[in-house]
Amino acid sequence: SKNLNRIFYNLKFNNNKSNLKEKLFEIKFKHLFFYFIKKYLLYFLNKINFFKKRKASLWSLHIYNYSKNFIKKINIKKSTKIESPKNAEWADPFIFSYKNKNYVFFENNDLNLNRGKISFGELHGNDLINIKDILKFKYHLSYPFIWKSKNNFYLIPETSEKKSIHIWKAKKFPSQWKYFKTILKNEFCCDTTIIKDKSNNNWLLTNKSNDSSNDPNNELYVYKIIGNFRKLIPHKLNPVITDCRTARNAGKLLIPNKLFRPSQINDSTGYGIGLNINNIDKLNLDSYEERTVKRIFPYKIPNTDGLHHINNSDKHIVFDVRYII
């Protein structure tokens, strides 16, 4: 009987062992199967994105005349394209009204050098005239944010290549500027914007990269401005946003009794594919809260695949659109 029990035990053990091997094989096979599916699916998706990226594309400025409540009623299809020279790409427009004239400041990218400079022009109807260069260096410039404080005009372009934020002050607005100050030295900052809250506090919002990737799309940093840039107090929650789909600044919207922050929509399908209009609900040194109230995509305009900047004056909206050519 002992021998029989031993035989049955060995048979059962070997059978369990065989089942265990089969189960382990099945698990390994499933893991390998899903691994290769994932690997080759990502490969083909990357190939698709690669060919998409190979399509030539250029940013262009658009102008749109509006009335009240434009956040709800904006129709970019009604906008007018501002034609740029053949060897140039125009983007990141900011519009400023001064002495009954409207001036548009923008990134003027020289396609021969692939380097941006800061230019401006006077709005005449739906076109820009008297275009002049105001900042031009051997490094890239973009996002010419204009800020007025106590009758002084300041220009804060994107100068991430220099790993600092350079501020310029107008000697004679809008055409003559002099260097004023450098802030956030040794920091890779992009698309710096200043907003004023209901208590008249000024806040600096910028996108930073803190690693070797130099990717500014993922994080938003906030600083309270003391005096005339005498001091910057960092927000306690910095970075207040860590999401490439909503973090990066995309211009400025001036709406009475509202605090909006436009931001770029960046995701796995591409860079600057559209805009978020975010309402800032809470802003102090201890907390930051915003919610997206509208998204704007360029697809109503034929042959486009991007829209990543917006700004307004009392009667006009300017934005940029990326055309597939």
Where would I find each of the regions flagged by the language model?
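Conserved anion/nucleotide-ligand pocket segment
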Residues: 1-29
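Carbohydrate-active catalytic/glycan-binding domains of CAZyme proteins
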Residues: 1-4, 32-325
